Amino acid sequence: MKKILIIEDNRILAENFERILRSNFSISKAYSAQEAILQIDKNLPDLILLDILLEGHSAFALLNELQSYADTSKIPIVICSDLASELDFESLKPFNIRHIFDKSQVYPQELRKKIEGILNE
């Protein structure tokens, strides 16, 4: 079963994302960038679902760190953020960003279908 790491500081949203995805994927969650790094070190995910606005350590710093290691630089990343409209997809492609969802407009079926498509490439 493919593994997804959800990095979301809002625990309720993280639980909602897990409910949407858990029937098809093995899910782990991290509520901060620091916790995400520990999770990734323990169990390399096949895909990361990432919120950009995290407390403490910036998600952009996390993206830079992931790019600095061969084993993590190839992990596909899907962003789900309130800042989706402000993000430039083209400038984020070097970080292996595959899709950007606006949290307020994402539908469960759409999220699941996009993630399945990315993991089946």
Residue ranges and their predicted role:
Residues S104-I115:
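C-terminal output helix
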Residues K29-L47:
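Acidic, metal-coordinating helix/loop segments flanking the phosphotransfer/catalytic sites
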Residues A59, S68, S91-H99:
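As written
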Residues R11-K29:
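Two-component/phosphorelay signaling modules centered on CheY-like receiver
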Residues E55, S85:
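The feature encodes the CheY-like receiver
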